[in-house]
Regions:
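Extracellular glycosylation-rich, acidic/polar low-complexity regions of adhesion-
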Residues: 1-178
Length: 178
């Protein structure tokens, strides 16, 4: 797994578009409501493998997500947009983001606990996006775990084999003041 520094602004995911459809840092909900999660800060996480038969997938866990923050990610199996918010006490809520309407998430590919999100069948094309806590700037030090899951079929039954490839790999998210 390869990770790199990510950089963005404190209002990432919370700003709106102007009348011409352009990002405008001056248009935002003062209460910190997430209005444009797709404008979050992309996390620079890439997983690779030498396995070329298509039987291998990756499970990525992002840790140390701050209270009041959020992660926006595309669900790998359905393509639905998922918004995971973390309350001030760290309690996560997973919802489907349907053009601003929050719906219940009933899938199992994305799970969350206090300060963490786990994404099964991780997709490099759609990296998760970090939304910092409202009005927060500075550096956020997240950690990434990754494992490969290789599935073979034996006597008609799928048999998964897991191999941890990274534990607590640091990823710094620099959040600039606006």
């Amino acid at each position: 797994v390869k990770v790199g520094q990510s950089i963005g602004y404190e209002d990432a995911g919370r700003t709106s578009l102007d009348k011409d459809g352009k990002y405008d840092k001056n248009i935002q909900d003062k209460d910190g409501t997430i209005t444009n999660p797709e404008k979050g800060i992309p996390l620079n996480i890439k997983v690779t493998s030498t396995d070329k038969d298509g039987s291998e997938t990756f499970t990525v866990t992002i840790k140390d997500i701050p209270n009041g923050g959020a992660i926006f990610v595309k669900e790998p199996l359905t393509g639905k947009d998922i918004l995971v918010t973390y309350a001030e006490d760290g309690t996560p809520t997973i919802k489907v983001w349907n053009n601003g309407i929050l719906e219940d998430y009933t899938g199992t590919t994305i799970t969350a606990n206090k300060g963490t999100i786990t994404i099964e069948k991780y997709d490099n094309v759609n990296p998760p996006k970090f939304i910092p806590p409202h009005n927060s700037h500075g550096d956020f030090d997240l950690k990434v775990d990754a494992k490969t899951v290789d599935t073979v079929v034996i006597d008609g039954d799928p048999v998964p084999s897991e191999n941890t490839t990274a534990i607590d790999k640091p990823i710094k998210v620099v959040v600039k003041d606006v």
